[in-house]
A protein has these predicted regions:
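Catalytic glycan-binding domains that act on GlcNAc-containing polysaccharides
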Residues: 16-128
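Sec-dependent N-terminal signal peptides
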Residues: 3-13
Length: 128
């Protein structure tokens, strides 16, 4: 029984959600660290993490889309979206895959167009 408990405990401690630096890096890449009701992508994205309406809806987070102007709320939306579409990458703290899905949607990890974006996020997430 002790062996099972140790294996069970190890399984949960071996997994790591993405570091806080992941969100800081997303914020820097998306809006250079600006906050507030920033419109981007020709008015189709809102806030410091540049969230689209469909992304917000897919996240399942309650609240009006306009709340995406708030950084803390936006982080909750991004976390819920990524946990839904990339649960393994989320549990493993796979910044590269998470950035690609944030940028390119549910299939973003397989889109070449997301590679440069993910490289920027990964680079910035490793800075102190």
């Amino acid at each position: 029984m002790k062996a099972f408990a140790l294996i069970f405990a190890f399984a949960f401690t071996a997994q790591a959600d993405p570091p806080d630096s992941f969100f800081r890096a997303l914020h820097l890449v998306e809006t250079s660290g600006k906050t507030g009701p920033i419109l981007g992508d020709r008015g189709r994205a809102l806030g410091p993490l540049q969230i689209h309406r469909g992304y917000h809806k897919d996240s399942g987070i309650a609240g009006d889309y306009s709340r995406c102007s708030d950084l803390a709320y936006s982080r909750r939306v991004v976390a819920a979206y990524l946990k839904h579409y990339a649960p393994i990458a989320w549990r493993n703290g796979d910044v590269h895959t998470l950035a690609r899905i944030h940028n390119g949607g549910p299939n973003g990890a397989s889109k070449r167009a997301t590679l440069i974006y993910a490289a920027k996020v990964r680079l910035l997430s490793h800075r102190p």
